[in-house]
Amino acid sequence: MELAQTLSQRQTMQMAGQMLHSLAILGMSSQDLSEHLTEQATSNPFLTYRAPPAFIARGGEDFDAVAAVAAHKPSLMAHVVDQIEMAFTETPDRLLALRFAEALEPSGWLGQSLDSIALAAGVSLSRAESMLAVLQGFEPTGLFARDLSDCLILQAREADILTWEVETLIRNIRLIAENRLSDLADLCDCDIGDIPEIIKQIRHLNPKPGLAFDHQPTPVFPPDLIAVRGAEGWTVELNRATSPTITVREDRFADGTADAKARAERRKALAEARALAQALERRGDTLLRTAAVLVARQSAFLDKGPAHLVPLTLEDVASELGLHASTISRAVSGRMIQTQTRALPLRAFFSRAVSTQGGGEAVSRDSALDFVQRTVGGEDPQNPLSDDAIVTLAERAGLRIARRTVAKYRSTLGLASSYERRRAAAAR
């Protein structure tokens, strides 16, 4: 009886350990998983690891995963997306920030005008300017600069060396290349002998901070999932470019020694190899099932944009799949899904419900935010819309939003009241 109890406890502990390992693997990024599998295959004789195509060097089929991990340098896009994930919690903010990220050149500067980004995102110019101010605070300083002067001024301000003379020199930096130091001295209102000292202050600044990152046509780590729009709707599949392969070499067990202790250790290693293979299979299955639910629930969002998000929480997805909400959280954390037009974070598919007028059908928080933002952004500045007018327009568009919700989200978006907007327009 006591022996049976002990065996049962051991089995329970073993199952708990395997479950924790599975959850840990589910939460790993493609890069972290590659490192983990490399380490496991190095130490476990019953495992062979085949890196996914995204990690395979061009030199041939022999892939040194350890060397690749050591030499890894993140892509500029991956670096920026990580910061966007941390900086913004609202889906409209994240999507607008991603529009800016897509406009980045390898240098780290913006490759598109603010007007074109605002137009593509469907937001006002002032909203785009506010977003740019936040993004220009990302590391390394100088990212999202509009030109060379903008980049150097951002860095000089960060380094606390942005005097009037330094800013003037930066804005007229072409005069240095043209050796027109006397003209530069006149502009800076200083002696020509002071110019070399001012130049010295900005010499350490990095004119192209984006070049510190890898620059491949696609991110170093492509999205884990791919969504495709077909005639019958959206379908989801795992991205084979990021899907690793491990093989459990059962045949190697017979090659072992007859020593009892050594055989016990080999049995343990074989069991760990099997558990890892199962955990990897569960990871892929959970990612695929989770993404399938998100795409099915938010197909209108994918087809038409943020205004068509429906309320959806981690708990909703977990309930549909028969899993815990924390498991879904691990599955979507930091993950991207690629559509025909762009890559989106899985977090963008979630949105909370908001208060509705007269207890109508639930509206997602993000669709309400997006509607208020687009409506105010497109109004006649001389005749701004009141909150009641926005409620009426929302009803005509099929969104039943309470007036207090409109007022709250207008404030969240940094939009003044209709009275204040009218006064501001009259003052211009």
Curated annotation (Swiss-Prot):
One of its GO terms (molecular function) is DNA binding. A motif (RPON box) lies at residues 402-410. Residues 313-332 bind DNA. One of its GO terms (biological process) is nitrogen fixation. GO terms for cellular component: DNA-directed RNA polymerase complex. Gene3D superfamilies: Homeodomain-like, RNA polymerase sigma-54 factor, core-binding domain. InterPro entries: RNA_pol_sigma_54, RNA_pol_sigma_54_core-bd, RNA_pol_sigma_54_DNA-bd, RpoN_core-bd_sf. Transmembrane segments: none annotated. It comes from the Bacteria. Keywords: DNA-binding, DNA-directed RNA polymerase, Nitrogen fixation, Nucleotidyltransferase, Sigma factor, Transcription, Transcription regulation, Transferase. Belongs to the sigma-54 factor family. Sigma factors are initiation factors that promote the attachment of RNA polymerase to specific initiation sites and are then released. This sigma factor is responsible for the expression of the nitrogen fixation genes. The open complex (sigma-54 and core RNA polymerase) serves as the receptor for receipt of the melting signal from the remotely bound activator protein nifA for the expression of the nitrogen fixation proteins. This is RNA polymerase sigma-54 factor.
